Amino acid sequence: MNGMVWVRVLVGAVWLNGGIEKLLNPEFPQQFASSLRAGGFISVAPPFFQDFMRGAVVPNAELFAQLMRVGELALGIALILGLLTNLAAVGSVVLSIVIVLSQGGVRLGTGLGAPEFLTVNVLVALLSVVILLTPAAKALSLDALLARRSAALSPLLLNRRRANRRRA
């Protein structure tokens, strides 16, 4: 197994772990809603993100908590299995950025998380970009199996062009 497969599985395990923790905590939606409604860390988020948080997320906090559970589980499973890896990698980047912004962005320290929180989420985002751009990350994946069955899917799933075959 190549190193990029391990990177893909590791990033998937980070998301899966977060999703399982949220799933096993029956109080998570209420805790998430309470922390959002307290609003202390929203004020340290970038201004454009504060508007989004106050206008969309806070009024629907329990729904967003459920979406986080499902999203983290889905990203973890997809990356570990290598199923729709490119889409999962994009989702991983987006969710990592949203999490960092919701905690105060690069001015982290006054929000809910420790500096390690910022480091982990930025690292997950960067590794997800590498997964997205690297064909080697799709080895030993369900995407590779699907691409073998349909050559037309290979560029989409594996970031590889179809070989030009000349007819004799």
Task: Locate each region found by the language model.
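Extended, low-polarity transmembrane helix blocks
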Residues: 1-74, 81-168
